[in-house]
Design a protein with these regions (language model features):
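Glycosyltransferase catalytic domains, chiefly GT-A lineage
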Residues: 2-334
Length: 334
């Protein structure tokens, strides 16, 4: 993997010209009438409370499967936070792999929203401090674990990645080396799909859709036959959906490097995998607090204490802890 282009790391203190203004961004999430509802409310409320310069930026929440559109009550709760809610038939695949929602919603947003930058987030996230979004074609975080990624030639998954690269017209060697965030394994670039900042007119998300749907047409499941049943923030996703796990991130990573070299890696303050830190440390830049937690927890009562415990471990401020605890207590009443 020697000789590949390296991604640029996010500076701890970017200059004013490197930072996106609030009127340049729109936040994009997917939400459905399932456990995502309460997660979306918590995420949007945290942005409004702790988002700093971005706290009043527009948020668009999309239900891409109208059969799972939000109830009027849930819609009103999001609208009270200044969220624009959209329900339209973007995902008509019938696939149990729910991440297709994010793929088709991102492609729709690139074609239809006016802001020059999209901040695409999974719903199972919480802002704990003001973010700083960088003026780059793409901003991302590495995947947490190797999972469906490839370490390069000789890796059992390299043929899968090579075929995906072919859909984008690039060689696998185009993908730069990267280290996974948790298990620290060397891989070809694979980015977490739950946090990305993309320049809208570049078309990364539409190309991601095209690559993924080409793989769907060929039934290319990276974890086919593994027997894995992934536990996600909506619960166990099922064996069939699990066989596709990581495929959206592969398509995204290949789409990025087929279109640009201007890629920024955000540091450890962003997309913190809270669900994996109960028995692990998580180094933060000296003197800085966590910004964005990706908790991956269903928000039932049994997961509140583990989430709050990890937030204390990360040294989230007392104000953030008290606010989150109050929000979680309120969610149990919904």
């Amino acid at each position: 993997m020697a000789g590949m282009t390296k991604q640029r790391l996010q500076p701890a203190e970017p200059s004013r010209g490197e930072t996106l203004d609030a009127d340049e961004v729109v936040f994009l999430i997917c939400v459905e009438a399932n456990p995502l509802e309460v997660q979306a409310h918590l995420l949007c409320a945290s942005l409004r409370r702790f988002g700093g310069r971005y706290k009043d930026a527009p948020i668009v929440a999309v239900s891409p499967r109208p059969a799972l559109a939000l109830s009027p009550t849930s819609q009103a709760a999001l609208e009270a936070l200044g969220v624009t809610y959209v329900s339209m038939p973007l995902n008509e695949t019938g696939s149990p792999y729910g991440t297709i929602n994010r793929i088709v919603t991102g492609a729709w947003a690139e074609a239809n929203l006016p802001q020059p930058y999209l901040v695409v987030l999974d719903t199972d996230m919480i802002f704990t401090a003001e973010p700083c979004f960088l003026r780059a074609d793409v901003g991302v975080r590495p995947v947490d674990m190797k999972g469906s990624a490839t370490g390069g030639e000789g890796d059992p998954l390299d043929d899968y990645w090579t075929r995906l690269c072919g859909f984008a017209g690039i060689a696998p060697s185009t993908l730069p080396p990267l280290e996974t965030a948790i298990d620290r394994i060397a891989i070809r670039a694979s980015y977490n799909g739950g946090f990305m900042v993309v320049r809208r007119d570049l078309g990364v998300l539409r190309r991601t859709r095209d690559i993924f749907f080409a793989s769907l047409e060929e039934n290319m499941r990276p974890l086919a036959g593994s027997g894995v049943n992934v536990f996600a923030s909506t619960g166990l996703v099922g064996v069939e959906a699990s066989e596709w796990w990581g495929s959206s991130q592969a398509a995204l990573s290949i789409a990025i490097w087929s279109l640009t070299l201007d890629v920024r890696l955000y540091d450890n303050r962003y997309n913190i995998p809270a669900h994996l830190l109960r028995d692990r440390s998580w180094p933060l830049p000296a003197g800085y607090e966590p910004v964005l937690l990706h908790h991956h927890y269903p928000l039932e009562r049994e997961y509140h204490d583990p989430l709050l415990g990890t937030m204390r471990k990360l040294a989230c401020s007392q104000a953030v802890l008290e606010w989150t605890q109050a929000q979680l207590a309120g969610l149990t009443l919904r």
